[in-house]
């Protein structure tokens, strides 16, 4: 089944909802970055939450989410333009921890809690909007939920999950978000809290073949699906873009690349594509500066 996202409204409970499947795009990321299981789970949860957050706005603004909790996985980043395409990476892809009592992937241990979640929204204005909150658990879902409350004053349930095969392949990835509308009542809040108490893990539901629509129907029988968007893991890097980035290092550094290494090789951190530049290309760049 292809990856996609749906948006919906639940008028009877005064909330809006989002759900997504990201299994295939996470598998692409896993292969590109050689992710180990806990790193896959961390990046998958982050990309699912980022895609759903981007779907809350229909103007295709660029959104960059960065998480660094001081844990061994290092800095994590995901970037999307709200068009269903996303790219992302983790600082150390070879991270794997499990909780001794449950055997579950220990994303919170890998990410850490001594740091922050930052969201930058570039809406094409002079200055992008930037919101930053301290990490709560490092488990990603809790941290996005806290972000929505602290930065956007929107009470939200964020459930994201990943299942990884023993071979490291991705079995299931995705999630859902429930956001209360301003007119929500105490009864609405109580209903949602009760509904979440025994609700199955979203990764298990996706692994069983449940679609995003079916997951939302399990939560709210009367949900009205309002939108659908296909999702992809894609990088927009190119040799020209990397060359433009190289132009910022300065003439002296470029000259030393020519003198010492007779060129250079740059790896895109989002997709691991390697770009080689020979002496002639670097000299042309120096001449342009």
Question: Can you say where each PLM-predicted feature lies in the sequence?
Answer:
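Interaction interfaces in information-processing and related assembly proteins
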Residues: 1-225
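Cys/His-clustered metal-coordination modules, chiefly Zn-binding fingers
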Residues: 196-289
């Amino acid at each position: 089944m292809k990856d996609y996202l749906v948006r919906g409204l639940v008028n009877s409970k005064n909330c809006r909802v989002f759900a997504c499947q990201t299994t295939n795009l996470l598998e692409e990321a896993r292969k590109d970055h050689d992710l180990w299981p806990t790193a896959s789970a961390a990046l998958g949860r982050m990309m699912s939450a980022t895609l759903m957050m981007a779907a809350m706005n229909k103007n295709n603004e660029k959104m960059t989410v960065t998480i660094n909790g001081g844990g061994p996985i290092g800095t994590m980043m995901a970037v999307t333009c709200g068009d269903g395409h996303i790219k992302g990476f983790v600082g150390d892809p070879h991270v794997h921890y499990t909780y001794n009592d449950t055997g579950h992937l220990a994303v919170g241990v890998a990410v850490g809690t001594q740091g922050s979640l930052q969201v930058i929204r570039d809406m094409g204005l002079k200055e992008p909007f930037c919101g930053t909150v301290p990490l709560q658990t490092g488990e990603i879902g809790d941290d996005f939920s806290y972000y929505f409350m602290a930065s956007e004053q929107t009470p939200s349930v964020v459930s994201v999950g990943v299942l990884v095969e023993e071979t490291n392949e991705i079995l299931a990835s995705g999630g859902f978000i429930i956001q209360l509308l301003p007119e929500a009542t105490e009864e609405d809040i109580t209903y949602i809290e009760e509904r979440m108490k025994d609700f199955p893990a979203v990764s298990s539901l996706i692994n069983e073949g449940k679609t995003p629509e079916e997951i939302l129907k399990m939560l709210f029988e009367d949900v009205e699906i309002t939108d659908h968007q296909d999702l992809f893991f894609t990088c927009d890097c190119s040799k020209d873009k990397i060359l433009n980035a190289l132009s910022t290092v300065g003439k002296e550094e470029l000259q030393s690349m020519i003198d010492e290494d007779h060129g250079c090789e740059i790896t895109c951190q989002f997709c691991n594509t390697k770009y080689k530049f020979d002496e002639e290309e670097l000299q042309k760049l120096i001449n342009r500066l």
